[in-house]
């Protein structure tokens, strides 16, 4: 994919130091998808980019190069970084890691970029991050072509009955079932997932269960670092409450 002629809307997903003064950036861009950039001298004391090239800060970037790693040529922050703290910050880190693990390099996904921006905006304002996370996971699955019909029984084609139970079969959909296990969902839960509107705790839990099932093949067996960090954060807080 050719380098852009002008500035592109982007976010930093992850950054790591390179040599004494540079950074390697994993970027999610509106028009070019995921790309890897080297920012030369970004860590030096004289660099005015040191504070700007951070996750969750809306950026305008320009780069050059044809290889797997491009060179950052220009960077301008659009605004201050989104105000993410506590559990919402860890949730946003999870979203970034999910994109980095699941999306291929240099595949344009402007629609998903807008879903990502919406998710970050929601997380910056939400008391409970779970609905925003589930909506983004579902948007990510849809962007990757993971097509599931939540509104019709895969066995009969009939509309989903809110009161009935359905069992998920990968690459087929939901089939009416009397069994109850990790792969079964109530009809009202499937309708809520389809609409991405979760009115009850049970619907939200069902959405989380489904996205974990659907994302597992893409993530493999390697644990998510953001999830481990979140667990580590919760343990000290739980211990302090017990005291």
UniProtKB/Swiss-Prot annotation:
Entry keyword Membrane: no
Q: Which GO terms describe its biological process?
A: DNA recombination; double-strand break repair
Which controlled-vocabulary keywords does the entry list? DNA damage, DNA recombination, DNA repair
Does the record carry Zinc as a key word? no
Q: Name one GO cellular component term.
A: bacterial nucleoid
Q: What does this protein do?
A: Involved in DNA repair and RecF pathway recombination.
Q: Which PANTHER family match?
A: DNA REPAIR PROTEIN RECO (PTHR33991:SF1)
- Family of the protein in this entry: Belongs to the RecO family.
Q: Which HAMAP family match?
A: RecO
Question: What protein is this chain from?
Answer: DNA repair protein RecO
Gene name, Swiss-Prot/TrEMBL: recO
């Amino acid at each position: 994919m050719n380098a852009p002629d002008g500035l592109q809307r982007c976010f930093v997903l992850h950054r790591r130091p390179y040599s004494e003064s540079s950074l390697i950036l994993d970027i999610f861009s509106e028009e070019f998808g995921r790309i890897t950039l080297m920012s030369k001298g970004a860590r030096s004391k004289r660099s005015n980019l040191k504070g700007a090239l951070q996750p969750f800060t809306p950026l305008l970037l320009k780069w050059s190069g044809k290889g797997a790693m491009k060179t950052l040529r220009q960077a301008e922050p659009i605004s201050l970084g989104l105000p993410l703290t506590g559990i919402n910050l860890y949730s946003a880190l999870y979203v970034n890691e999910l994109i980095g693990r699941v999306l291929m390099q240099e595949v344009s996904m402007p629609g998903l970029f807008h879903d990502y921006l919406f998710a970050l905006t929601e997380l910056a304002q939400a008391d409970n991050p779970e609905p925003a996370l589930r909506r983004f996971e579902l948007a990510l699955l849809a962007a990757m072509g993971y097509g599931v019909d939540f509104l019709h029984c895969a066995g009969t084609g009939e509309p989903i009955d809110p009161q009935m139970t359905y069992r998920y079969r990968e690459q087929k959909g939901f089939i009416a079932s009397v069994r109850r296990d990790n792969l079964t969902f109530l009809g009202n839960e499937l309708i809520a997932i389809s609409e991405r509107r979760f009115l009850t705790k049970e619907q939200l839990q069902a959405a989380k269960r489904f996205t974990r099932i659907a994302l597992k093949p893409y993530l493999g067996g390697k644990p998510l670092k953001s999830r481990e960090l979140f667990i580590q954060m919760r343990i000290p807080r739980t211990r302090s409450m017990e005291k």
